[in-house]
Curated annotation (Swiss-Prot):
Encoding gene (name): Pdap1
Top-rank taxon: Eukaryota
Full protein name: 28 kDa heat- and acid-stable phosphoprotein
Posttranslational mods: Phosphorylated by several kinases in vitro. In vivo, can be phosphorylated by CK2.
Keyword set includes Ubl conjugation: yes
Cross-link (Glycyl lysine isopeptide (Lys-Gly) (interchain with G-Cter in SUMO2)): 52
Residues modified as Phosphoserine: 19, 57, 60, 63, 176, 178
N6-acetyllysine: residues carrying this PTM: 132, 164
Biased composition (Acidic residues): 60-69
């Protein structure tokens, strides 16, 4: 702990910004209260028609405030700072009556990419099985070379076996000829 105790207190947790709409609403409410007090002081009984007009004006002001709140309800510093981020998506809340359950469900980016990846893989496998991809062509060429090598090896084996059989037959003939003498 440094000398003199702790310095500084809470940094920014207690800061609260008032939105311009709230400030305007407070100013209008104060003006209306001041007007009402002035009118009450000036004419007590004869001002029965005026409060009705004031109530109408109050109702219209409240409806305007409600419209403003309905259009854009900003929290914290958002009301003070204009955000110009084109990538920012404003999430709008929908009522139950506005929900479209019958329409196609929009997939997230990851889900879409996963489906596209699977489709691309399936397309590639079909092309590969049909022998239309470069890898399939290379595989088929390699298989053809191996097939030729095996055929040649089988042919050589057959020739060697025939040669061996001929040698054994010729050897037996020699023996039989020598025995006949």
């Amino acid at each position: 702990m440094p000398k003199g105790g702790r310095k500084g207190g809470h940094k920014g947790r207690v800061r609260q910004y008032t939105s311009p709409e709230e400030i305007d609403a407070q100013l209008q409410a104060e003006k209306q209260k001041a007007n009402e007090e002035d009118e009450q002081e000036e004419g007590g009984d004869g001002a029965s028609g005026d409060p009705k007009k004031e109530k109408k004006s109050l109702d219209s002001d409240e409806s305007e405030d409600e419209d403003d709140d309905y259009q854009q309800k900003r929290k914290g510093v958002e009301g003070l700072i204009d955000i110009e981020n084109p990538n920012r998506v404003a999430q709008t809340t929908k009522k139950v009556t506005q929900l479209d359950l019958d329409g196609p469900k929009e997939l997230s980016r990851r889900e879409r990419e996963e489906i596209e990846k699977q489709k691309a893989k399936e397309r590639y496998m079909k092309m590969h099985l049909a022998g239309k991809t470069e890898q399939a062509k290379a595989d088929l060429a390699r298989l053809a070379i191996i097939r030729k090598q095996r055929e040649e090896a089988a042919r050589k084996k057959e020739e060697e076996r025939k040669a061996k059989d001929d040698a054994t037959l010729s050897g037996k003939r020699m023996q039989s000829l020598s025995l006949n003498k």
